[in-house]
Amino acid sequence: VAVFGADTDVSPYDSGSYASSTTYITGMAVVKACNELKKQICTIAADLMGCEEDAVEFAGTCVRRIDTQQTVSLTDIAYKAQVNNTVPAETTQTHTSPVSPPPYMVGMVEIELDKLTGKVDILDYMAVVDCGIPINPNLARIQTEGGIVQGIGHTLMENVTYDRNGRPAESSFMQYKVPTRQDMGRLKVEFEHSYEPTGPFGAKSIGEIVINTPGPA
């Protein structure tokens, strides 16, 4: 697998990673690519074992012949794919979706408010997220926590003001305030699983929902 980043000479066109489309859209393209590559691997393995393609099955680290239990490793298949082979072990897949199933999130926050100064301290923040079946629960939790921090910062701290000459007064992070971990109190994130049939392995998006929820909360 060769991944080229930030080189427009060799990278294919991509419209960008935004609008909660990375896991939901790109993930399905990855699923399609893997399924097609698995077919190619089985075709090459069947040729190596001298049988029909429908007589073999993909078994993770190898391909197994169903009737004799003979196996051929992915290492041998990869070598065959590069030497004297007519089946390319590579594929390019795309994916679009006519639907965009929404994720859901509940945010509950306990604050301490100084009625005289208006200062708000976050004591507890509880979030429950339905993003389908999380592909990577740890990363989904981290993204949720990061989004909550961003949302709280956007709501309570971040602001752009201008001086009388029209120049931004916030020229660095010394003036433009963003929250730190000490500003967050206790964060707790739970997931309510639901299976989304149009997403990769039942997943939905999670990007924007975790940032948008803290403001109303």
Locate predicted features.
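C-terminal catalytic domains of large/alpha subunits in multi-subunit enzymes
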Residues: A2-A217
